[in-house]
């Protein structure tokens, strides 16, 4: 694993710890924390936010494609995907899951044809 991958995993793990600390059950204050407010509103509010961020990601990608996939428009894709990942991590935390659970699932699928993996889900 490269240093870049390790630091990326570290960032995700640290963020997961912060998200966990923002849960109202762990002392997160909805009046002082955006994440605590999302947790206090429940999973429908989190899911709505993920839907919004997914749409913004799609729109940023379309804008980047129209701009030749370079420059500031391409940078907006990264910005929107970061928002999408962040809110997906809030959802994971809401269900007691971590980024490591997702990474482990991706590792399980590594080297497996997408069509083969999809067929296995039907079993």
Swiss-Prot record:
Do you know which Pfam families this protein is assigned to? PRA-PH
Instruction: Give the matching NCBIfam families.
Output: histidine_hisI, PRK00400.1-3
List the taxonomic lineage.
Bacteria, Pseudomonadati, Pseudomonadota, Betaproteobacteria, Burkholderiales
Q: Where in the cell is it found?
A: Cytoplasm
Query: Top-level EC class, please?
Result: hydrolase
Signal sequence bounds: none
The UniProt similarity line reads:
Belongs to the PRA-PH family.
Protein name (Swiss-Prot/TrEMBL): Phosphoribosyl-ATP pyrophosphatase
The entry lists its GO molecular-function terms as:
ATP binding; phosphoribosyl-ATP diphosphatase activity
Q: Which PANTHER family match?
A: HISTIDINE BIOSYNTHESIS BIFUNCTIONAL PROTEIN (PTHR42945), HISTIDINE BIOSYNTHESIS BIFUNCTIONAL PROTEIN HISIE (PTHR42945:SF9)
Pathway noted in the entry:
Amino-acid biosynthesis; L-histidine biosynthesis; L-histidine from 5-phospho-alpha-D-ribose 1-diphosphate: step 2/9
User: Its Gene Ontology biological processes?
Assistant: L-histidine biosynthetic process
| Catalytic activity entry | 1-(5-phospho-beta-D-ribosyl)-ATP + H2O = 1-(5-phospho-beta-D-ribosyl)-5'-AMP + diphosphate + H(+)
Note the InterPro entries from the entry.
HisE, PRib-ATP_PPHydrolase-like
Q: Does the keyword Hydrolase apply?
A: yes
**Statement: the UniProt record of this protein carries the keyword Magnesium:** no
Record key words, sorted:
Amino-acid biosynthesis, ATP-binding, Cytoplasm, Histidine biosynthesis, Hydrolase, Nucleotide-binding
Task: Output the Gene Ontology cellular-component terms.
Answer: cytoplasm
EC number, UniProt record:
3.6.1.31
Which organism does this record belong to? Cupriavidus necator (strain ATCC 17699 / DSM 428 / KCTC 22496 / NCIMB 10442 / H16 / Stanier 337) (Ralstonia eutropha)
């Amino acid at each position: 694993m490269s240093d870049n991958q390790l630091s990326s995993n570290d960032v995700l793990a640290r963020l997961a710890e912060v998200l966990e600390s923002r849960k109202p059950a762990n002392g997160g204050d909805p009046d002082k924390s955006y994440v605590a407010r999302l947790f206090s509103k429940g999973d429908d509010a989190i899911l709505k936010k993920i839907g919004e961020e997914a749409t913004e990601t799609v729109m940023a990608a379309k804008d980047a494609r129209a701009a030749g996939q370079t420059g500031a428009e391409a940078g907006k894709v990264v910005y929107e995907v970061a928002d999408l990942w962040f809110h997906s991590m809030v959802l994971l935390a809401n269900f007691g899951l971590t980024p490591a659970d997702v990474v482990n699932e991706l590792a399980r699928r590594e080297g497996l044809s997408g069509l083969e993996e999809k067929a296995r889900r039907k079993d």
